[in-house]
A protein has these predicted regions:
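Helical "substrate-binding/catalytic lid" subdomain
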Residues: 162-274
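NAD(P)+-binding Rossmann beta1-loop-alpha1 motif at the extreme N-terminus of oxidoreductases
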Residues: 1-63
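Hydrophobic beta-strand scaffold residues
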Residues: 27, 47, 112-114, 155, ...
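Rossmann-fold dinucleotide-binding core
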Residues: 3, 93-169
Length: 286
């Protein structure tokens, strides 16, 4: 099976590398940044110059681009000269409606689409330990599985088209809420003179443990705005009132990797315009 990747930034490049190393066929790559594609040549991944080239070369095409409009634009371009039966697996995180629009565009030319967004971020991509949350027909997902398996610890079929994106959004909601909850809770520890990193290690053996806390050092806080926009849009469409997530949407945007490092390993941590230190080291500052 020949695989193609559209979008070979840090995530896409790592995923393509695993498919090349573990797969059973050629791997092709396209990116608007030619240098990103050329950087993969020493792994045996073949560069292509246009989206038309990749749609003619690959049986399964993994799309991991930035946003909804890019997914639609890429699907449109892939479909123009696409080979009937070619399967597009959207690994980007987008709104479920975007998946349905993409599927309509592709179906008009005989191409197939599934949603296959991934969890565990850049670390999971580098280690080949992502979780693929898939929406689409069982047949299409099984056809994509030989490619998805190469970079995934597990491939889950959640339901019809769009359900993978909903599942990814639910995961993101819990992840970002945990980021805020972990930060605020450990601020209490720091304020009262407890080593936050040592307490984190203890909490990972207690009922309060969560996956976000375990991997907190690697959280990059790259996409909270996009992720929460999708979550709150789904809440509105579902006529749901979710007051907690209105607060999470605001608070998670104040967190940074440096702030987490300061909280866990430093003498002070920033939060909401203040600098929090232990009481016996001068109070909360700010």
């Amino acid at each position: 099976m020949k695989a193609g990747f559209v979008g070979v930034g840090a995530m896409g490049a790592a995923m393509a590398g695993h498919v090349q190393a573990k797969g059973q066929g050629e791997v092709f790559a396209y990116d608007v940044r030619r240098e990103a594609v050329d950087a993969l040549a020493d792994q045996g991944i073949k560069p292509v110059d246009t989206l038309a080239d990749i749609t003619r070369a690959a049986d399964v095409i993994v799309v991991i681009v930035v946003d909804d409009q890019q997914v639609l634009d890429v699907t449109e371009a892939l479909s123009v000269d696409g080979v009937e039966g070619t399967l597009i697996a959207v690994a980007a995180t987008v709104h479920p409606d975007t998946m349905r629009k993409a599927a309509e565009i592709a179906a008009a030319k005989g191409l197939r689409v599934i949603d296959a967004p991934v969890c565990f971020g850049l670390y999971g991509a580098k280690e080949g330990q992502l979780a693929s949350l898939c929406g689409g027909s069982a047949e299409d997902i099984e056809d994509a599985r030989p490619v998805l398996d190469c970079y995934s610890r597990a491939v889950h079929h959640i339901g019809p088209l769009g359900c993978g994106q909903i599942a990814k959004t639910v995961n993101n909601m819990l992840h970002w809420a945990n980021c805020v909850a972990n930060y605020e809770a450990l601020l209490i520890a720091k304020r009262f003179g407890i080593d936050a990193q040592k307490l984190r290690e203890v909490l990972l053996q207690c009922p309060a443990r969560n996956g976000t806390l375990a991997d907190w050092d690697s959280t990059r806080f790259t996409w909270p705005i996009k992720d929460m926009d999708i979550a709150l849009a789904l809440a509105r469409e579902g006529e749901l009132t979710l007051p907690l997530y209105g607060q999470v949407d605001h608070l998670v945007q104040t967190l940074t990797p440096d702030g987490v490092k300061g909280l866990l390993y430093g003498d002070a941590a920033p939060y909401l315009g203040r600098t929090v230190t232990a009481k016996d080291e001068g109070g909360h500052g700010g």
